[in-house]
């Protein structure tokens, strides 16, 4: 449903499983996630679908967040399951355990991949002592939000490790970590946050 400034209903459509994550995106177009096709759809002001966006390189887009940029680019991410020998890290680990990592992709307006970032190159489970190794699947990096900071680099929210991470948009290197076991910042006269579910750069 879309309401005007006075609360009057001006648009309504039932899309079932397709209607997830509705928002007016950074390019001023409406975007939403289709849980059946695993893609993000872009609508114009007349509610016509003008584009559909999927992860590339055999990754499957996640429904948590999506950026449609003013320059025509798109930013989306995927959870990446890998088999990992966690018994080398914890006595509760196993030789062959499923661990969920993260892949971020930026696509140009023609849907070509111009940036791809993989958490396996930058995050190490041994750095996070509070991981629960008793689960059948370890949800290591549960990213639930992504944004672009005022200097153009990525901000991501990783809920399971209670960390907000800033990532260089060209090199992929981590600029800083905020919160969690590897924080580059300290909290003064306040409690650290945990299990956060959103991140927005306020400038």
Residue ranges of predicted features:
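Histidine-/acidic-rich catalytic cores in large beta-rich domains
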Residues: 1-203
């Amino acid at each position: 449903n879309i309401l005007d400034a006075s609360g009057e209903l001006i648009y309504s459509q039932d899309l079932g499983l397709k209607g997830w994550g509705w928002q007016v995106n950074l390019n001023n177009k409406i975007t939403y996630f289709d849980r059946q096709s695993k893609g993000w759809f872009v609508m114009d002001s007349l509610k016509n679908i003008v584009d559909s966006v999927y992860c590339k390189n055999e990754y499957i887009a996640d429904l948590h967040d999506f950026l449609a940029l003013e320059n025509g680019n798109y930013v989306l991410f995927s959870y990446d399951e890998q088999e990992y020998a966690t018994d080398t890290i914890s006595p509760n680990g196993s030789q062959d355990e499923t661990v969920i990592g993260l892949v971020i992709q930026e696509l140009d307006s023609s849907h070509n991949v111009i940036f791809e970032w993989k958490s396996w190159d930058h995050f190490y489970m041994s750095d996070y002592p509070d991981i629960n190794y008793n689960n059948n699947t370890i949800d290591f990096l549960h990213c639930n939000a992504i944004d672009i900071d005022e200097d153009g680099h990525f901000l991501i929210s990783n809920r399971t490790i209670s960390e907000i991470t800033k990532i260089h948009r060209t090199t992929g290197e981590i600029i800083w970590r905020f919160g969690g076991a590897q924080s580059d910042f300290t909290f003064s006269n306040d409690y650290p946050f945990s299990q956060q579910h959103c991140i927005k750069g306020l400038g």
